[in-house]
From Swiss-Prot:
Residues 1-17 form the signal peptide. One of its GO terms (cellular component) is endoplasmic reticulum membrane. Substrate binds at S164. The gene is DHRS9. It is found in: Microsome membrane; Endoplasmic reticulum membrane. One of its GO terms (biological process) is androgen metabolic process. This is Dehydrogenase/reductase SDR family member 9.
Length: 319
């Protein structure tokens, strides 16, 4: 009996994997729209899907990013300049995309644009330090989605929201994790709303990757700039040794981040082209083996493991 149960489980696993590998047909007549294509995941995704034969519409924040991308891709790829925090800019872009795709609609929307913002202890920050990541990562994503949604519904297509392991575990103060937690919530509600329309909504949760967004040198510079303007009381509580060690720790992350950005693009590819896409994708070994498993553990264990990495404060009782 146990033998046949084992055989059944192996067969089910084989059939499940086979099902996941089935692909859609006729990608050469399908349009996809990707935000945040100047650099990083979005740039690689635009170039990859252009080579595969999709009609790619790549949204770039800068003219230089747009020009560089067009120089590396085929005539099928079009770029638009887009600031996702500008509602009028988003509306104009959506109208332009509508004119491009016509009755075919938009097969894929990849919400990739995002920023890290300031990463520092919460008691160092002001409300304004939280605002920019939330405006870009959350409200920008929602704005683009709502404006493009009629086109995706017409094609019965796919929406792919790039979140982060920072949407599962908050490991630093600032607006990044709150914005990504909110993206996860929006993603879940949108997925359920769009089910009846035949639109599949997926979420990608990358681990730590080497991109412009997560450049440890820039992150350290921002943290040091905030430190210099803190009140004497806060500086006394944390101590000079804290800022020195925490900056070293930040810069040290460069040695263990994922460098292969294609791991994220492969998730996008599966979500776009599989007949049976997943609802969630973890990208990077750290996400799969540490961050995601840790997110399912009790808070007391999460705190124990994450606080072990924290730099000690000089005098936290000096309040």
């Amino acid at each position: 009996m146990l033998f046949w149960l084992l055989v059944l489980l192996i067969l089910c696993g084989f059939l499940w994997n086979y099902k996941r590998q089935l692909k859609i047909a006729n990608i050469t007549d399908k349009y996809i729209f990707i935000t945040g294509c100047d650099t990083g995941f979005g740039n690689l995704a635009a170039r990859t899907f252009d080579k595969k034969g999709f009609h790619v519409i790549a949204a770039c924040l800068t003219e230089s990013g747009s020009t560089a991308l067009k120089a590396e891709t085929s005539e099928r790829l079009h770029t638009v300049l887009l600031d996702v925090t500008d509602p009028e800019n988003v509306k104009r872009a959506a109208q332009w995309v509508k004119n491009q795709v016509g009755e075919k609609g938009l097969w894929g929307l990849i919400n990739n644009a995002g920023i890290l913002g300031v990463l520092a202890p919460n008691d160092w920050l002001t409300v304004e330090d939280y605002r920019e990541p939330v405006e870009v990562n959350l409200f920008g994503l929602i704005s683009v989605t709502l404006n493009m949604l009629p086109l995706v519904k017409k094609a019965r297509g796919r929406i792919i929201n790039v979140s982060s392991i920072g949407g599962r575990l908050a490991f630093g103060g600032g607006g990044y994790s709150p914005s990504k937690y909110a993206v996860e919530g929006f993603n879940d509600s949108l997925r359920r709303d769009m089910k009846a329309f035949g639109v599949h909504v997926a979420c990608i949760e990358p681990g730590l990757f080497k991109t412009n967004l997560s450049d440890p040198e820039k992150t350290a510079e921002k943290k040091l700039a905030i430190w210099k303007h803190l009140s004497p009381d806060i500086k006394q509580q944390y101590g000079e040794s804290y800022i020195e060690k925490s900056l070293e720790q930040l810069k040290g992350t460069a040695s263990f981040v994922n460098v292969d950005l294609s791991l994220v693009v492969e998730c996008m590819d599966h979500a776009l082209t599989s007949l049976f896409p997943k609802t969630r994708y973890a990208a990077g070994k750290d996400a799969k083996t540490f961050w995601i498993p840790l997110s399912h553990m009790p808070a007391v264990l999460q705190d124990f493991l994450l606080l072990k990495q924290k730099v000690e404060l000089a005098n936290p009782r000096a309040v």
